[in-house]
């Protein structure tokens, strides 16, 4: 089993802070102009009244007034708010230090580019080989060793007294020879009986 993961690019966060004066830069999030080249409206009641009366009621919207107080409503810019870096939350992914309070920040744009390519190849090979033992048959058990066939009558008196077993006929009727063959015949009979019992 093999598992391979190919990560082409890790998630990255890039931020850009525009310092000092900016000339009508368009934000990628809102699409509004946040440049500082626009003029502040004079915060006095007469200018506010003149400005409001010069506009038609259909053109007056939430961006024209942030409160009912004329002195505070037009001290706020309609498109962007002037602030400094120390007053906001830093979302900078770099290790640079935050700018001083004298430097204004117009915009922080985020681009979250995530590209993960995963290739999972599962190669499995299973090989099973089984071999069963064959049962031993009785014929295979018996044919393992071929012993000479035992003849019960091989130790007869004629065989014992045969001249071929004597040394030039010297011990033809030797008593020890008779006892030996008699003992051998009894041992063969016992062996044959044991084989039959098995």
From Swiss-Prot:
Magnesium is required for ATPase activity. The keyword Transcription does not apply. Residues 153-166 have a biased composition (Acidic residues). GO terms for molecular function: ATP hydrolysis activity; magnesium ion binding; nucleotide binding; RNA binding. GO terms for cellular component: host cell cytoplasm. InterPro entries: Rotavirus_A/C_NSP5. GO terms for biological process: viral genome replication. Residues 16-37, 53-72, 85-106, 123-166 are annotated as: Disordered. Homodimer. Interacts with VP1. Interacts with VP2. Interacts with NSP2; this interaction leads to up-regulation of NSP5 hyperphosphorylation and formation of virus factories. Interacts with NSP6. Participates in the selective exclusion of host proteins from stress granules (SG) and P bodies (PB). Also participates in the sequestration of these remodeled organelles in viral factories. This is Non-structural protein 5. It comes from Rotavirus A (strain RVA/Cow/France/RF/1975/G6P6[1]). The lineage of its organism: Viruses, Riboviria, Orthornavirae, Duplornaviricota, Resentoviricetes.
């Amino acid at each position: 089993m093999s598992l391979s993961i190919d990560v082409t690019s890790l998630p990255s966060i890039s931020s850009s802070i525009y310092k000092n004066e900016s000339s009508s830069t368009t934000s990628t999030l809102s699409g509004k102009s946040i440049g500082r080249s626009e003029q502040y409206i004079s915060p006095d009641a007469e200018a506010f009244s003149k400005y409001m009366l010069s506009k038609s009621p259909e053109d007056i919207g939430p961006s024209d007034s942030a409160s009912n107080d004329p002195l505070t409503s037009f001290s706020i810019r309609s498109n962007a708010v002037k602030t400094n870096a120390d007053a906001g939350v830093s979302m900078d992914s770099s290790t640079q230090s935050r700018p001083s309070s004298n430097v204004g920040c117009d915009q922080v744009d985020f681009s979250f580019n995530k590209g993960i390519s995963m290739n999972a190849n599962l190669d499995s090979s299973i090989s099973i080989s089984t071999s069963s033992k064959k049962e031993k048959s009785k014929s295979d058990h018996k044919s393992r060793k071929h012993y000479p066939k035992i003849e019960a009558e091989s130790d007869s008196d004629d065989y014992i007294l045969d001249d071929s077993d004597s040394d030039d006929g010297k011990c033809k009727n030797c008593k020890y020879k008779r006892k030996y063959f008699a003992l051998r015949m009894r041992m063969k009979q016992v062996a044959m009986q044991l084989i039959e019992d098995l």
